[in-house]
């Protein structure tokens, strides 16, 4: 493995020859060559775009979960307040309206 890494450093000037003979091995051993090879650049763009898409998808899920949690937490607070203070039922209604606005 060490000998091959030394060879890959000397083969930087011969990128085309290196891709035809050992394209996969260079991708695993030499990280610097990934930026030089156009194939690795395309793979990097795909992976980067995919990670960015995952971030957007997760953010949508998180916003949806946060909205659900707020709604559930408001219901729990309303139930607790109603059980604890039966006279102040109007306060629960105002809390409902506030939660719907958010």
Curated annotation (Swiss-Prot):
UniProt keyword list: Chromosome, Developmental protein, Differentiation, DNA condensation, DNA-binding, Nucleosome core, Nucleus, Phosphoprotein, Spermatogenesis
Broad class of the protein's primary localization: nucleus
Any one Pfam family match given in the protein's UniProt record, by short name: Protamine_P2
GO cellular component: nucleosome; nucleus
Modifications made to the protein after synthesis: Proteolytic processing into mature chains is required for histone eviction during spermatogenesis. Transition proteins (TNP1 and TNP2) are required for processing.
One GO MF term: DNA binding
Compartment(s) of residence: Nucleus; Chromosome
Sites bearing Phosphoserine, chain numbering: 8, 10
InterPro entries named in the record: PRM2 (IPR000492)
Compositionally biased tracts (Basic and acidic residues): 8-17, 39-48
Residue ranges, compositional bias (Basic residues): 49-102
Summary of subunit composition and partner proteins: Interacts with TDRP.
Function: Protamines substitute for histones in the chromatin of sperm during the haploid phase of spermatogenesis. They compact sperm DNA into a highly condensed, stable and inactive complex.
Family recorded in the similarity comment: Belongs to the protamine P2 family.
PANTHER family, A to Z: PROTAMINE-2
UniProt-recorded name of the protein: Protamine-2
Native source species: Macaca mulatta
Source lineage: Eukaryota, Metazoa, Chordata, Craniata, Vertebrata
UniProt gene name: PRM2
């Amino acid at each position: 493995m060490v000998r091959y890494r030394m060879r890959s450093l000397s083969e930087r000037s011969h990128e085309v020859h290196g891709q035809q003979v050992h394209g996969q091995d260079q991708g695993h051993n030499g990280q610097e060559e990934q930026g030089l090879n156009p194939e690795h650049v395309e793979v990097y763009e795909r992976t980067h775009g995919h990670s960015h898409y995952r971030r957007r998808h997760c953010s949508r899920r998180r916003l949806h979960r946060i909205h659900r949690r707020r709604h559930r937490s408001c219901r729990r607070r309303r139930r607790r307040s109603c059980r604890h203070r039966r006279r102040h039922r109007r306060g629960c209604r105002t809390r409902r309206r506030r939660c719907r606005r958010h």
